[in-house]
Amino acid sequence: MMNLLSNDGVQVLPRPFTLNERRREVRSFVLRQGHFTPAQKRAFDHYWPRFGVDFIGQLRDLDVLFGRSAPKVLEVGFGNGAALRFAAQHEPRYDYIGIEVYAPGVGRLLNGLAEDGSRHVRLYHYDAVEVLNKEIVDGALDEIRIYFPDPWHKKRHHKRRLIQPLFATLLVRKLRVGGCLHMATDWADYAEQMWDVLDATPGLVNRAGLRGQVPCPDWRVQTRFERRGQNLGHRVWDLLYDRV
């Protein structure tokens, strides 16, 4: 059951959206279609009611959504879900929220979560900016993870990169004081842009010092994107910022 709060604190229980309705509702980006297998389609049909959160545009009480009070971790753009699934398996004391627009990746993770018997993961198939702006209360998150966002490697496309000043300010708003922001990239110039943006964002302090990086933490499993980058000779930058 979804748990929403209206402006006057009244609980609102909307009807679930179908997969086609979720696709039509997204307006701020073009969904990557990819190859949507029958198994992934069945995952939406069978497991979305258990793990899925339909975008409504109203603030949510996350403790009610998960049925408990626990630290909340958000992963933006979880891809095929490998990192999020790994974290949920190995850090069960956390509640996890994942956001992804790539339907096959969502379907794959739904199948994995059902196989694992996970109870503390909720997924959005929607635009992260919209979810953060309209459904996540300020200061509600203990950690935000963004692993290997699209580098938009051509210079003329850099403006499309996710990590921009306005988005960084939004992330700061949603993190509680004492929380952290963890990002990883295998593109050197994107790491430079992340440092440029985040070091200039009030409320964030690089745990490794100015333009510093940390070793890959235990909670981040190596993804196929990371392995692909390493095969191309790319190194990986893990950046960890504390919310102050």
Swiss-Prot record:
Gene3D superfamilies (alphabetical): Vaccinia Virus protein VP39
Residues reported to bind S-adenosyl-L-methionine: 75, 100, 127, 150
PROSITE patterns according to UniProt: SAM_MT_TRMB
InterPro entries in the cross-refs: SAM-dependent_MTases_sf, tRNA_(Gua-N-7)_MeTrfase_Trmb, tRNA_methyltr_TrmB_bact
Pathway connected to this protein: tRNA modification; N(7)-methylguanine-tRNA biosynthesis
Keyword annotations: Methyltransferase, S-adenosyl-L-methionine, Transferase, tRNA processing
Domain of life: Bacteria
Family annotation (Pfam families): Methyltransf_4 (PF02390)
Catalyzed reactions: guanosine(46) in tRNA + S-adenosyl-L-methionine = N(7)-methylguanosine(46) in tRNA + S-adenosyl-L-homocysteine
NCBIfam families on file: tRNA (guanosine(46)-N7)-methyltransferase TrmB
Protein name: tRNA (guanine-N(7)-)-methyltransferase
Gene name as annotated: trmB
